[in-house]
A protein has these predicted regions:
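Short N-terminal segments immediately surrounding and downstream of signal-peptide cleavage
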Residues: 26-46
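Active-site HxH/HxHxD metal-binding segment of metal-dependent hydrolases
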Residues: 85-165, 182
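Divalent metal-coordination and catalytic microenvironments
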Residues: 49, 63, 73, 87, ...
Length: 312
């Protein structure tokens, strides 16, 4: 239950609502939603018809084919018209396909609007299940703005090896072992040499690990070996949040998470409580590079502590 409460608070952070002090050892904080009328959706051209749209929520991948457009993730619904405008500058072809990397609102909030327009939505089986449950659950609706909307439910569930062929490009879907959640998809634009990770990788700040939905720090650390092997020196990586990255950024991120895990494991072995661990500020040196954004040190310490404590 403590993990569920803590994770729900982190989801609120990701959805930029509020965080309860009771959810973790960190102090309460409140983050306001932006002025949507002034929020930009910025286009990063990655070549070969692949673009990254960057804005308030999760990054969107765009593949512009000669007959159709494929999107990866859907942003906040309040930004839907701006997303459409950005896509229209890239291609005049219709948006036909939408792939959800996972179920969190800042990546699937726009699903309903796309679904109503006839876009076919794809996800893992787990992601579809979580979206359905979030729509039906009053608790989830209170924690994030899910509401009953059949058009927002993915209509096709996919697993490893599924490939899209759009505009001469091959797009491979990979359902990775549990990492950020247990339903994560990463997307490989093969000819373009681009990989989109969803929230399995944040570029420049601590990760979110959705433990109640199968997330695990060990799974994230292991995934970065896979991402590194998939990548070459010129591969562009679209993270869930943050700027475009490369494989050396992934390797550096893996090193940071290994260090976090090592320090928390040492505290667990020494018999420290979670509160004692948080009070000791063991990640202050890492905060200088990785802290101060979406995920704060006390939250990360708490979720890693619970995972390692449960494993003992």
């Amino acid at each position: 239950m403590k993990t569920l409460i803590r994770w729900a608070s982190a989801l609120l952070t990701m959805s930029v609502l509020f965080i309860s002090a009771a959810a973790s050892a960190r102090p309460a904080e409140k983050m306001d939603l932006p002025d949507w009328s002034r929020t930009l959706v910025e286009d990063r051209d990655l070549g070969h018809g692949v673009h990254m749209l960057e804005s308030f929520g999760g990054n969107i991948g765009v593949l512009a084919g000669d007959q159709a457009v494929l999107l990866i993730d859907a942003e906040w619904p309040q930004l839907h018209d701006k997303v459409l405008a950005a896509v229209s500058h890239i291609s005049k072809q219709p948006i036909r396909y939408l792939i959800n990397t996972h179920w969190h609102w800042d990546h699937v909030g726009g699903d309903g609007q796309f679904g109503k327009a006839g876009v076919v939505i794809f996800s893992s089986e787990q992601t579809r299940e979580y979206i359905e449950k979030a729509q039906a659950s009053k608790a989830s609706q209170a924690g994030a703005p899910y509401a009953p909307d059949p058009a927002a439910i993915p209509v096709v569930t996919v697993n490893n090896g599924v490939k899209f062929h759009v505009g001469g490009q091959t797009v491979e879907i990979i359902h990775v072992p549990p990492a950020h959640t247990n339903g994560d998809l990463i997307v490989h634009f093969i000819e373009a040499d681009v990989i989109q990770t969803g929230d399995t990788f944040f570029h420049g700040f601590y990760p979110d690990i959705d433990q109640p939905h199968g997330g695990t720090i060990d799974g994230m650390i292991a995934l970065y070996d896979t991402l590194y092997k998939m990548s070459g020196p010129n591969t562009k990586i679209i993270p869930g949040h943050g700027p475009v990255a490369n494989r050396e950024d992934v390797r550096e991120y893996q090193g940071m998470l290994r260090e976090v895990r090592k320090r928390v494991a040492r505290a667990v072995a020494a018999g420290m409580t979670e509160e004692q661990l948080v009070a000791s500020h063991p990640l202050d040196d890492l905060d200088k590079k990785w802290g101060g954004n979406l995920i704060k040190q006390p939250y990360l310490l708490g979720i890693v502590y619970e995972e390692l404590k449960a494993a003992n």
